[in-house]
């Protein structure tokens, strides 16, 4: 669910913050099109991911606000004949309020598309991060060395370790 997803983003953001603090002054090459372009800091580089994931979190929160309305009492689309205080029931169930229009309540699924979009954006940002982990762990870059716990051996080269978790997540 959206709340759980935000929790995972919070954990990831905390890790990114720690990395930024630890590497605030550490210089690294900045790249454009996989070519060295200009110097930057590791903190600045991770700051880009921080901004991406903050926007992702914000999108989830915005979507939650729009989804937190109760359709109870909307019926098939024209409401119900039962004497129901929809606002009171909505509040008791923890919703912000009852939906305004019963037809819209039961016939539109835009909230699903919005939530899937949020998840797609998060996936894209995670994929980008995982791709960098793979690159940075490669022999060509050599910026990081992942623990054997997060690596698997190569089928063809016995001395090479692959960042399999990152590849699968990507």
Locations of regions flagged by a protein language model:
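Long, non-coiled-coil amphipathic alpha-helical linker/lever segments
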Residues: 1-38, 99-111
């Amino acid at each position: 669910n959206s709340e759980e997803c935000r929790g995972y983003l919070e954990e990831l953001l905390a890790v990114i913050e720690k990395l930024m603090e630890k590497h605030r002054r550490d210089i690294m090459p900045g790249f454009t099109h996989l070519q060295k372009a200009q110097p930057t800091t590791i903190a600045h580089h991770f700051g880009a991911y921080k901004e991406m994931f903050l926007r992702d979190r914000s999108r989830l929160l915005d979507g939650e606000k729009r989804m937190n309305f109760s359709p109870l009492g909307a019926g098939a689309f024209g409401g119900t004949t039962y004497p129901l205080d929809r606002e009171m029931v909505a509040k008791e169930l923890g919703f912000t309020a009852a939906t305004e229009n019963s037809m819209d309540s039961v016939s539109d699924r835009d909230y699903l598309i919005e939530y899937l979009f949020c998840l797609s954006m998060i996936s894209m940002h995670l994929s980008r991060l995982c791709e960098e982990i793979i690159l940075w762990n490669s022999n060509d870059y050599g910026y990081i060395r992942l623990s054997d716990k997060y690596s698997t051996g190569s089928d063809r080269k016995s001395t090479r370790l692959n960042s399999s978790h990152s590849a699968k997540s990507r």
